[in-house]
């Protein structure tokens, strides 16, 4: 990681809640609100934006942990801001506190951890996972 990455670095992601961000099970939308999984995705994205500018050319980040407490709903059409802040750097790990806001209303909070690896190490890990999948067959048997 570049020395420019510090505790306190931040990034924000802004989005308009759309119907494709609503919770749906078996293709049926159950609520016209921002889903927990959409919030989790946007929290990952904001945390990635904290890390990405500070990666060396030979490095890549990989997610290791995400916790989300979904505290309040946001309706379709609402503007949501996800804020990520680096709160801990420990060797090759970055921990971000992530929060989701609609105006002054706290919608959610959590933590996201990314590990920074050399790209060739990550490629070996992914290749090993692909081989496991090929050995089992794509249907998991």
Residue ranges and their predicted role:
Residues 1-35:
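Catalytic strand-loop segment that frames the active site of acyl-thioester-processing enzymes
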Residues 9-13, 39, 62-66, 76-82, ...:
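A generic structural signal for short beta-strands and their flanking turns/coil linkers
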Residues 12-18, 69, 111-115:
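Generic structural detector for well-ordered beta-strands
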Residues 19-23, 31-32, 53, 60, ...:
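Flexible, active-site-adjacent loop/turn segments at secondary-structure boundaries
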Residues 47-81:
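Hydrophobic beta-strand-centered segment that forms part of the acyl-chain substrate-binding groove
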Residues 75-76, 86-141:
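HotDog/MaoC-like acyl-thioester-processing domains
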């Amino acid at each position: 990681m570049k020395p420019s990455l510090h505790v306190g670095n931040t990034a924000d992601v802004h989005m308009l809640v759309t119907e494709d961000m609503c919770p749906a099970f078996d293709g049926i939308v159950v609520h016209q609100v921002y889903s927990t999984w959409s919030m989790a995705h946007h929290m990952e994205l904001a945390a990635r934006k904290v890390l990405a500018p500070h990666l060396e050319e030979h490095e890549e980040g990989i997610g290791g942990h995400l916790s989300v407490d979904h505290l309040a709903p946001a309706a379709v059409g609402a503007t949501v801001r996800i804020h990520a802040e680096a709160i801990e750097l420990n060797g090759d790990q970055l921990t971000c506190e992530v929060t989701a806001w609609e105006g002054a209303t706290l919608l959610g909070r959590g933590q996201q951890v990314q590990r920074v690896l050399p790209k060739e190490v990550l490629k070996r890990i992914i290749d090993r996972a692909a081989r496991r999948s090929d050995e089992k067959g794509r249907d998991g048997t």
